[in-house]
Amino acid sequence: MTIVLNHTIVPARDKRAAARSFAEIFGLHLEDEASTHFAPVRVNDALTLLFDEDAEFESHHYAFHVSEAEFDAIFRRVKAAGIPYGSAPWSLDDGKLNDWNGGRGVYFKNADGHILELMTVPQ
């Protein structure tokens, strides 16, 4: 049996703004919110991020394996939005990419302080 993550909750101060920003940066679409309490963003056929409001929360780290073309498109939007980025979770604003595992990687924070990671890994 293959185990696949179906959804996870992403805490946010403003769930709709956070979901909209994530969708714009990642080139995705907001799902219909009418039937749910959450602000959902479908990442792929298996995974949906459910943004939910919370007054207090710790920051989380969300890592996404993407194709080279997806990396280029998302990274362009990160830079166009003026979001600081870096090569590691401990250097989020060094303006560099990493080449770990033979691919490219980058880290950046969203408005709620969550660390988002993009990585390409040759298959």
Model-derived features: positions:
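Core segments of cupin and vicinal oxygen chelate
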Residues: 2-3, 9-48, 53-55
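Vicinal oxygen chelate
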Residues: 5-13, 55-81, 83-123
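Short, flexible helix/strand-to-coil boundary loops that buttress conserved ligand/catalytic motifs
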Residues: 22, 75, 120
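Generic alpha-helical hydrophobic packing signal
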Residues: 27-28, 38, 43-44, 78-81, ...
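Short acidic/glycine-enriched loop/turn segments that link adjacent beta-strands
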Residues: 35-38, 58, 93, 100-102
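Short beta-strand segments
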Residues: 47-49, 60, 116
